[in-house]
């Protein structure tokens, strides 16, 4: 298991504590997607760094947008090479046709402090963490939990 301070872990919500205890063998990879309608030159850095911040609780982080202006793509490539965030061009009409423009680089460690903050602020994320814990305890996937 990752080296975690007992004092710090004592401040986490129970969902995070329970997940960390069973996550040590990493049979899964956690993914984070920050979805925007449009990325252009004026909002590219803000959207990107929001993705960086919100994806530290995942092994892979992606910035997803329905529209990405060509002048923003160069900046995204530069930022992605430094921070490992991937970029997906979303086809809203046919999501299976969406394109990975820049693949994300895998992070080996999860920022559990950020995961704890997200779990305390967002019940959907807390439920997601609970599903991961259940998977690790039972090695079974209940498909209805993930839809």
Each language-model region and where it sits:
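Non-catalytic C-terminal interaction segments of nucleic acid-processing enzymes
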Residues: 20-23, 77-147
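Histidine-anchored nucleotide/phosphate-binding helix
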Residues: 46-54
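Nucleic-acid nuclease catalytic cores
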Residues: 39-44, 57-95
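Short, charged beta->alpha transition segments
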Residues: 16-22, 50
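Short acidic alpha-helical/loop segments enriched in Asp/Glu that coordinate divalent cations
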Residues: 11-13, 47
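Conserved catalytic cores of phosphodiester-cleaving nucleases, focusing on short active-site segments
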Residues: 1-11, 28-40
């Amino acid at each position: 298991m990752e080296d975690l301070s007992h004092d710090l872990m004592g401040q986490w919500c129970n969902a995070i504590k329970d997940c960390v205890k069973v996550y040590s063998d990493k049979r899964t990879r956690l993914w984070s997607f920050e979805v925007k309608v449009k990325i252009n030159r004026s909002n590219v850095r803000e959207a990107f760094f929001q993705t960086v911040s919100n994806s530290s609780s995942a092994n892979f982080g992606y910035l997803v947008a329905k529209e990405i202006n060509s002048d923003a793509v160069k900046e995204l490539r530069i930022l992605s090479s430094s921070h490992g965030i991937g970029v997906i061009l979303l086809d809203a009409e046919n999501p299976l046709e969406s394109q990975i423009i820049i693949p994300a680089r895998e992070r080996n460690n999860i920022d559990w402090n950020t995961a704890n903050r997200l779990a305390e602020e967002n019940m959907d994320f807390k439920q997601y963490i609970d599903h991961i814990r259940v998977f690790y305890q039972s090695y079974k996937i209940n498909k209805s939990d993930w839809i």
